[in-house]
Amino acid sequence: MNFKQAYYEEPIIKDIKSSNTFSLSEQVDESILPENLKRKDLELPEVSEYDVVRHYTRLSQMNYTVDVGIYPLGSCTMKYNPKFADRVSAIDGFRNIHPFQPENTVQGALHVMYDLQEYLKKISDMDAVSLQPMAGADGEFTGILIVKKYFEDKGEDRTEIIIPDSAHGTNPASATMGGFDVVEVPSDDKGMVDLEALRAAVSKKTAAFMITNPNTLGIFEQNIEEIAKIIHNAGALLYYDGANLNAIFGITSPGLMGFDIVHFNLHKSFATPHGGGGPGAGPVAVKSFLKDFLPVPIVDFDGNSYRLNYELKKTIGKVSSFYGSFSILLRAWSYIIRNGDDGLKNVSARAVLNSNYLKKKLEKYYDIPYYPLKKHEFVLSTENTGKRALDIGKYILDNGIHSPTVYFPLIVKEAMMIEPTETVSKADLDNYADVLIEALKLSDEELKSRPKNTAVRRIDEVKAARDLKLKW
Amino acid sequence: MDEISSMLDYLGIKSTEELFSDIPLSVRKKEIGIGSPLDEHLVLERARKYASLNSTEMLNFLGNGIYDRVIPEAVNYIISKSEFLDSYTPYQPEVSQGMLQSIFEYQSLISDLFKMDFTNASMYDGYSALGEAARMAYRINGKNKILIPESTYDSKLSVLKNYVWGLSMKIEKYKMNEEGKIDIDDLQSRIDGDTSAVVVENPNGYGVIDENVFRISEIKKESLLISYVDPISLGVLKPPGEYGSDIAIAEGQQLGIPMNFGGPLLGIMSFKADYVRKSPGRLIGESVDADGKRAFVMTLQTREQHIRRAKATSNICSNQALLTLAAGSYLSILGSSGLKKVALLTIKHSKNLAESLGNIGIEKVFDSISFSDTLFRIDKNVMLDLAKKGILGGIKLTSLIKDSKYSSGTFFTATEKTDNEKIKALVNALEVIM
C-alpha cells in the first residue's frame, strides 16, 4: 500500500488567534466572591469553537488508528472494535446518570453490571467479581491487596510475590506497590516457567505467584496444574494476569487451571477503543474463599431488584471513587452478548490461527525462539538478521502498518512482539509478512533513515529527556 | 478456498482445534454458558431497554465528586474522532503526533490553570491521584505520616489507605473549625518531623471555600503540601501554585466528561518541577525530529513500569489519555472567560439555592461561602421522597462520612445549570416533604 501520513505545521492551541465563542447567557457579577479568595490572572487560550475543532481535526489526521489499518503489536490486543459497543455506551440513559442516584432510579445500569459480573464468572470459572478497578494494572494492584489482606487475616507474615522473568512490567510494579518483595523466576528453554527454579523460589514467605497464561511469549504454560500444586502446597495464592485471556475463551479458563484471583482487561479482551492509552477497566474475580475480601460495592440481585452491596465482611475497601469504568463495562457487556459462546470461542480460534499463520510465514527469515506452537501472539528476534528491531519497526510504519511492540519481553534480544488479533484478514497478514521480509533487504543506512512517510521523522528522544519541556 | 481453509492448509492442519493441542485435557472447558450470539440490532434493543430503566430526566442536585455540567457538543465530537478514540499508547511517536500534541496541550492547560510547573496525563480518578500523591510524597522525603482533613469522605480515605498500605504510612485526620474550615491550631499541633505531607481541600468535603488553605505553607515545616482542588473553581479561586502547593490534584470529570454513573474519570496531578523524576504516570515532552521539525514524544519513561518494573514510580499502563483530550478540548473551548463564567455562575446558583432554602426554614450548616456542594440542616432523609417527585438530591453527610458530628447535614449541589426555575421546583418539593 502506498502510505503517506498527513502533516500540518499545526500550532499549539495557545498560539491560535481568534475570539472565544463559548457563551452562557445568564449574567453574574464578579463581586459575588470576596477579593481575598480570587485569583488574579488566568491564561487559558481564547479561541473560537470552530478553530478548536479544526485544530483537533488536523491533529487527528496526524494520528494512526486501528480504523485506518492493522495494529499488530503484542500484549495489548489492538483489534478492530465493533461500533455498536460505542453506540451502547453513548445512550443517554447510561451516560447521564449520577453514581449517587437512588438505586431504584438506576436499575438498568445495575442490571448490566450484574449480568457482566455473571458473564465474567462464567468465562473465567471464578466465583465472585468486583467491577471496580479502573484498568488492568489497577486490577493487579487490587488483587495484590486482596492477597495482603487474606494473609493478614490468617495471621501469616508472607512478604514475597513470585513473578516470571517474561511477565508484564505492571506485575512487579503492582506487587511492589502492595509492599511485597518481588522474586523473579527464569523461563526454561521452551519459554515456560522453569519448574525447578519455581520450587526453589517458593517458601513460607511466598504470598502469591503472578502469571499470565498464555504468557507474553504467546506460549501456553503446559505445566500449569503442577505450578498450581507447587504454589498451593506452599500455602500461597495463584494470581492470573488476564491480559492474554482472549487466546483461550471457551477452551480453558483460569478457574479450571487452579487460579485463585484473576483480573480482566475488559478493554483488551472484549471491546473498547484504546483511546491513545485508555481508559480501561480491570475487574477482579476470585474463588469463593476470597469473596469477602473484594473491593465494595458489588452488585447483588434478590430476584426483584438490583442493589449495591457494601457488606463484604473483610473487604479491602475501595480502590477507586465509585463503581469502576462504567462506560467501559457497558462495552464489554454488549460485546459478550453479541458474541455468545460460539462467537467468543471463534475470537480465540481466529486470533491463534492468525498468529500461527504469520509466525510460519516469518520463521524462515527471523529467529522465533522457544516452543513452536504459539497462541495469540509470538515474539521474534531480529538478532540473527543483523538488523535492529527498532529500525525495522520504523520501516514498518512507512508501509501504513503499526509496528510491533519492540524490546519486550526483556528475555528475548532484539525482540519484536506480534499479536495480529482475530480482526486481521489473511490478505493483511500476507502483506505484513511481505513488509517484514522486505525490511531485511534494505541497507542499515536505509533503515536508519526511516520512517519518512509519517507526519514527522525519527524523534530525538534524548533531547526530550535532557531539555525537559513538558509545558508550552 | 476461503481464507481460513487456506491458512489451515498452509499450516498443514485440519482445524483450529489442533492449535490448542498444548492445553492439557484436564483443564479443558466444555462450554462458556453465555448463550447464543445476539444480532447487533438486538444488542442495541436490549441496551436501550435497560437504559430506559435509568432515570435521566430528573432535576439534578447531586454532586460531591461528580457533577452535571454543560459539555459543549464539540468536546464529544472531538473525542469521538476515531484517530483519537481508537489509537494506542503512543509508543511509535512518528505516527502518533496528534495524540501526543493533544496530551502536551492538556499538560500545559492544566499547569496554567493550577499555576504548577508540570502535569502528568495518567491518573484514573481524583481519589487514586490522592493515593499516588501520597506515595510520591513518600518517595520525595521518606517520611511516614500524612495529615488529612476530617471532612475527607470515607471512600476517599479508603482509597488513600489502600495506596499507602504497602508503605506502612500513617494517616491522621486534623480538625475543622465551626465555619467548616481548617482548624489551623489543631493542624499545626500535629505536624512533626515525621510528617510527609499535609493534604488540604479547597473547596473541602463540606463544600466550603476554605481560605485557610492559603496559610498552610507557613506552618507545614519540612512536610509537603498536597492540595485537592475543584478544577472548575480555579476559574475564579486562587490556584494551588499560588499558595505553595508541592503537588496539586483533582477529579477532572467536570472538564467535559459525562457523569457515566461515576466512571471512567480523570485524575489530575500537577507538581513542582523539582519532583518530576519522582512523579508517577506518563509525561509527554517536546523535542525535534530528524529534520529539525518540532515533535512530541513520551519522555522520562525510565521511571515507568515497562522499563523499571519493581522500581517504577507507578504501575500505570492503560490510563486516561482520551479523557485528557476531553479536558483539553473543553478548556480550549471555554477559555479563561468561559471557565470564569461557569465558576461564578456556580457560586451564584449555590447562593441562590441557600437563600431559597433559607426562606422555607432550611438553614446552612456553615456560615461560609460554598462552591457547589452546600450542606444544610435537615434531620429527615429526604432523598427517596424527592426522587418520587423527579428530583435527585439530598445526600446525607453521614453516608459520605459515617461518624461525622454533623448528623443532620444534607447536601444539595448547584452547577451553572442550576437556574432559578430548578431551585424553585426543589423548594416546592421540599415544602411538601418536610
Swiss-Prot record, chain A:
Kindly list the GO molecular function terms attached to this UniProt entry: glycine binding; glycine dehydrogenase (decarboxylating) activity; pyridoxal phosphate binding
Q: Which residues carry this modification: N6-(pyridoxal phosphate)lysine?
A: K268
For whether the record's keyword set contains NADP, the answer is no
Reaction(s) the record says it catalyses? N(6)-[(R)-lipoyl]-L-lysyl-[glycine-cleavage complex H protein] + glycine + H(+) = N(6)-[(R)-S(8)-aminomethyldihydrolipoyl]-L-lysyl-[glycine-cleavage complex H protein] + CO2
Q: What class of enzyme is it?
A: oxidoreductase
| Assembly description | The glycine cleavage system is composed of four proteins: P, T, L and H. In this organism, the P 'protein' is a heterodimer of two subunits.
HAMAP family of this UniProt entry?
GcvPB
Protein task: The glycine cleavage system catalyzes the degradation of glycine. The P protein binds the alpha-amino group of glycine through its pyridoxal phosphate cofactor; CO(2) is released and the remaining methylamine moiety is then transferred to the lipoamide cofactor of the H protein.
UniProt name for this protein: Probable glycine dehydrogenase (decarboxylating) subunit 2
What organism is the protein native to? Answer: Thermoplasma volcanium (strain ATCC 51530 / DSM 4299 / JCM 9571 / NBRC 15438 / GSS1)
Q: List the gene name.
A: gcvPB
UniProtKB/Swiss-Prot annotation, chain B:
Q: Which InterPro entries match?
A: GcvPA, GDC-P_N, PyrdxlP-dep_Trfase, PyrdxlP-dep_Trfase_major, PyrdxlP-dep_Trfase_small
The catalytic activity of this protein is classed by the Enzyme Commission as 1.4.4.2
The UniProt GO MF terms for this protein read: glycine dehydrogenase (decarboxylating) activity
Question: Taxonomically, which superkingdom?
Answer: Archaea
Query: What is any Pfam family matched here?
Result: GDC-P
**Role according to the record:** The glycine cleavage system catalyzes the degradation of glycine. The P protein binds the alpha-amino group of glycine through its pyridoxal phosphate cofactor; CO(2) is released and the remaining methylamine moiety is then transferred to the lipoamide cofactor of the H protein.
Q: So what family is this one in?
A: Belongs to the GcvP family. N-terminal subunit subfamily.
**Known partners and oligomeric status:** The glycine cleavage system is composed of four proteins: P, T, L and H. In this organism, the P 'protein' is a heterodimer of two subunits.
What is the name listed in the Swiss-Prot or TrEMBL entry for this protein?
Answer: Probable glycine dehydrogenase (decarboxylating) subunit 1
Which organism does this record belong to?
Answer: Thermoplasma volcanium (strain ATCC 51530 / DSM 4299 / JCM 9571 / NBRC 15438 / GSS1)
User: Mind giving the lineage of the organism this protein is from?
Assistant: Archaea, Methanobacteriati, Thermoplasmatota, Thermoplasmata, Thermoplasmatales
